[in-house]
Structures are given as structure tokens and as C-alpha cells.
Design a protein with these regions (language model features):
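Short C-terminal tail/terminal secondary-structure segment
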Residues: 1-2, 148, 224, 236-250
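Substrate-binding pocket helix/loop in short-chain dehydrogenase/reductase
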Residues: 90-109, 194, 205
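Short, small/polar-rich loop/turn modules that mediate ligand/substrate recognition or access, typified
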Residues: 175, 180, 235-237
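The beta1-alpha1 cofactor-binding region of Rossmann-like NAD(H)/NADP(H)-dependent oxidoreductases
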Residues: 54-65, 105, 218-219
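Active-site helix of classical SDR
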Residues: 123, 159, 167
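Amphipathic alpha-helical dimer-interface segment in Rossmann-like NAD(P)H-dependent oxidoreductases
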Residues: 114-132, 171-172, 176, 229
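C-terminal helical subdomain
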Residues: 183, 206-231, 235, 244
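Catalytic Tyr-X3-Lys loop
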Residues: 85, 99-120, 135, 139, ...
Length: 250
């Protein structure tokens, strides 16, 4: 069994009320971490986790949450930038040779505000705490589509590709302070939201994955825990695929 060295660490998980975020918060708690869940929505059961109602795209909201966590536990050792939303649509939709719709500014901004700006705002707020504390780990959720693009997801792909760029930049900037920065690129993950899709769509996801199945939220949570652990102490600036081989097969 890998010794993670995470017991007693203070971990912030954004978007931690459900899905991958919820599984991630639970997995860090299992390692003996003190976990603060940041989300717009309160989880159904917080157990012994701290909960902060946070809009990750809003500087004041994030600053207040950081102050609350530091007031309670003294520091932040690990930040998991997991919060994300979808608002899919084509850049330009054409029917019978005529343009019938385009992606609106509001649709583009809604996704990039959370999925890209939110990662920036949270990392900017937490990094000084980690520098003062002598180091830490910053992990962010990108996506396989941030690597190869995807039809109907201009906003989402732009944000997830941006997360990859920010991760590599911050690895260069923050490494000297003992802060490791990495990202994961999940593939098709069987969250409750995804599993509610039609079976034909789900089968298409499985068929597109070389392992022949979708991943679970716990698969991503395990990757986050490993990347935050002592076992990954020399992994820095990496973009780790957790996708069942999708990128390899694309």
C-alpha cells in the first residue's frame, strides 16, 4: 500500500458537492485529511467535512472562503480545482444552408467564468497561503477534449485547454516555493448526470474508450490523491490522462 503522507493535511475541493468533486472530498477525508468543500450548492451530507458556499469565479467569495479555512485550520496544503459546468452548443448552427443560431456571449462566458476564470481566481487566492506555509499542491481538472477538441463545445474546450496552459505556467512560477502544480484530463466518467443520458449515448462513450468502459468518479479521486501524495513528490507540471485510453485511440 502506498504511504500518501496526507494525514492531517488541509485540502480544498471546489465543486465538491457532487460527482467527481464529492468523490474526491470523500477520498481525501479517508486519508485523514481535513477537507473543505467549496460549492454553490450544499452537499446532501457534509459528514465531518467543512462546507463553504463559494462562487469560484468571484474574487470576494473565494477570498472569504480562504480566510475561513485558514481561520479554522491555519493553512491550505492542497487545492483541487474541480468545479465545472457545461453549456454545449455549436459556434454556428446551419440548417438547410441558413444560419439558425450561434453561440451567445452569455453561453461562452458562463462556462469560461467557472471552468477557467474559477481556476485562476482560486489558485491566485490560495497560492500565497501555500508560499507562506512552505509549499503545497495545486491540482486542476482539465479534460481530454482540452487536448483534442470536441464538436459543440467551443466554450468548454477553450476553458479546459486554458487550464492546461495555466498549469504549465504555474509549474514554472511556483515550483521554487515548494508548490507542485499538475492537472488531470478525465475521459468519460459515469457521474449521476452522465448516467442519466440515453443508453445509446452511453454505449457510444464506452465504444470510444479503448478500455471499453467509462471511468468512475473514484478513478479521478484516486488520481488526485496520488498526485497530492508523497509518492508523486517529483511530478510537477504534468498533465495526467485518466481516460481509459481515449487520447491514445483518437
Amino acid at each position: 500500500m502506498i504511504e500518501t503522507g496526507l494525514s492531517g493535511k488541509v485540502v480544498v475541493v471546489t465543486g465538491g458537492a457532487a460527482g467527481i468533486g464529492r468523490a474526491t472530498a470523500a477520498r481525501f477525508a479517508k486519508e485523514g485529511c481535513r477537507v473543505s468543500v467549496w460549492d454553490r450548492n450544499e452537499p446532501a451530507a457534509v459528514d465531518d467535512l467543512d462546507f463553504q458556499r463559494v462562487d469560484v469565479s468571484n474574487t470576494e467569495s473565494v477570498t472569504a472562503a480562504v480566510q475561513a479555512v485558514v481561520a479554522r485550520w491555519g493553512t491550505v496544503n492542497v487545492l483541487v480545482n474541480n468545479a465545472g459546468i457545461l453549456r454545449d452548443g455549436q459556434l454556428v448552427k446551419v440548417k438547410d444552408g441558413a444560419v439558425v443560431s450561434t453561440m451567445t456571449d452569455e453561453t461562452f462566458d458562463a462556462v469560461t467564468d467557472v471552468n477557467l476564470r474559477g481556476v485562476f481566481v482560486c489558485t491566485r487566492a490560495v497560492a500565497p497561503v501555500m508560499i507562506t506555509g512552505g509549499g503545497g499542491v495545486i491540482l486542476s481538472a482539465s479534460s481530454v477534449v482540452g487536448v483534442y477538441g470536441n464538436f459543440g463545445q467551443t466554450n468548454y474546450v477553450a476553458a479546459k485547454a486554458g487550464v492546461i496552459g495555466m498549469t504549465k505556467t504555474w509549474a514554472r512560477e511556483l515550483g521554487k516555493y515548494g508548490i507542485r502544480v499538475n492537472a488531470v484530463t478525465p475521459g468519460f466518467i459515469a457521474t449521476d448526470m452522465v448516467q442519466a443520458m440515453p443508453e445509446k449515448v452511453l454505449q457510444g462513450m464506452r465504444d470510444h474508450t479503448p478500455l471499453g468502459r467509462m471511468g468512475s468518479p473514484e478513478d479521478i479521486a484516486n488520481a488526485y490523491v496520488w498526485l497530492a501524495s508523497d509518492a508523486a513528490s517529483f511530478i510537477h507540471g504534468a498533465i495526467i490522462p485518466v481516460d481509459g485510453g481515449i487520447v491514445v485511440g483518437t
